């Protein structure tokens, strides 16, 4: 794609939720869920059915989205710094999509949960509020109460719940930017549906008294074949602690209610684009920073490399494309977001690991043997894992030795077994595939070793992940 003339540059809207299970949207086949605006976006654009977050936890995933770098390259995650959370290096931030677009003349705005800090010589780092033309972001987890989010206080009276306030922020920025005719990039990171469970009371009746079918892999008996290491993180305990086992309908009703408010905000944003007369040149991307187990396999929360945790929604609406209401089945990942935005806005290829998804507008094309890493080096070391997705296969390696455990691996054929019910690691029928995947894994570890950021956490992990077992 050639460099675009300034007048041809599209507006970019990037919308990201927090902890959204792929089965929570109508366009992904969720029964009993009401998401008309997001489904409308899908109907007008392309739905990506095999999109993964390379690290299924918010801080690392958000840094990857912004930069196109894997976690072991950018080093941003909880507790991965020398004396606290890993801060993003200034050199990496300068190459993030918001900074590159601003340097290219885009008007930039951010609202919501930013998720990480930029290194500035202090222990805590800085949030980049001065790096955007308009800022509605916040540190930490932010709050569902708008008045508690300092940069969003002006919306508190009319929109007391934060989710709709972000819709209002987006609406106002879009309308103001459209007046000046300058291309813009608006990024909104919703807190929803992240815990604590505080849905907007305006929508209490949406799912009141409703029941929801459980996925076919729901419950502990469908996770017995998982590694013992996977049960050493807090995800296993949260199946009980968060009441998926005994109050599933109530828990999911509130979860879906949080997402319904996001859908309302998406509607506000799309209406603003249309009302401003810029719908023909405004690209919209919708995704989540990670998935959510919601009781599948007897787990709660996220982090682990299984489908419910690592595979997330991705919808791209590009008015320049003739493709509408189509689906892409190629394997894609959050490392591709920055490359896609920069390609769409500037017509420039990226030097990062990510790939532009513009070519996937032709959904009949296949992508070949691309390998998407799935990384977890957060939480207890017992639950550390490294895996990847390649074509229909997923390979996971659990390196921890001790407490009666030894290194183990899992292989799933996602085409035949999308619910990950059958570990094929000892299946002689896939012996050749196993050898191929093990070689791919070994190369992935070597790549980590060669390109890891110079921080002890990631250097140590390199040694840990060399295969010692099956």
Task: Map each language-model feature to its residues.
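Formylglycine-dependent sulfatase
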Residues: 1-408, 418-439, 443-446, 453-456, ...
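Short hydrophobic beta-strand that contains or immediately precedes a catalytic carboxylate
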Residues: 411-412
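Residues forming the ATP-binding cleft of Hanks-type serine/threonine protein kinase domains
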Residues: 415
